[in-house]
A protein has these predicted regions:
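Ubiquitin-like/PB1-type beta-grasp interaction modules and other compact soluble beta-rich domains
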Residues: 1-78
């Protein structure tokens, strides 16, 4: 299983802070498994994905394996 963490407003859109999906998990699989509202947000270039503790420079290259943790990182705003 792959543990997927939904951070910030993405958790609100998904209705959960974490979910578990069957491994392996790639970009297409992730989009198919999450809610349509989260899938839409993931298309935004300001939303990033971390896998195994590293932010992916190309989120479409996601290749999560058994036991991996994937974090969905919403845009950060500040003042």
């Amino acid at each position: 299983m792959v543990r997927v963490l939904f951070l910030g407003p993405l958790a609100d859109l998904e209705g959960a802070e974490e979910r578990f999906f069957a491994a392996p998990l790639d970009w297409g699989g992730l989009l198919a498994q999450v809610s349509s509202r989260v899938a839409e947000q993931l298309q935004d270039s300001r939303v990033h994905i971390a896998c195994r503790g590293s932010v992916l420079s190309d989120k479409t290259a996601l290749d999560a394996k058994e036991g991996d943790e994937v974090a969905l990182l919403p845009p950060v705003s500040g003042g």
